[in-house]
Amino acid sequence: MDKISGAVYGGAVYVNLTPHELNVVMDDGEIVHIPPSGLKATCDTSTVPVRRIGGATGYRRCYGAVHGIPDPQDGVVYVTSGPAAEAAHRQDVVSPGDQIQLADGRRACKGFAVWDED
């Protein structure tokens, strides 16, 4: 994992595969800042028209193949968008948890959303 930035906390390296800076509130209350790594995970997306909603069409968004997630490495957790994490379906790929606003006005998330079955 040469020259990929991440944050180390609790025995894991968190690599942010989104273009956004992340503040994650850990279980002990610590706020861990995870900067963008410079890599970006993407997920193929298509839309299917479902129904009319007033004067607009309502679409179902469908997700397909994931791109840009490195191979698994011991102790490394990759943080991606929810759709990319769900499509990847790997234990080492997560997405930001519930969004909150900190007392100082910064946005953060509470932990991570997981998308594997284990």
Segments and roles (model prediction):
Residues 1-13, 19-118:
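Intrinsically disordered, low-complexity segments enriched in small/polar residues
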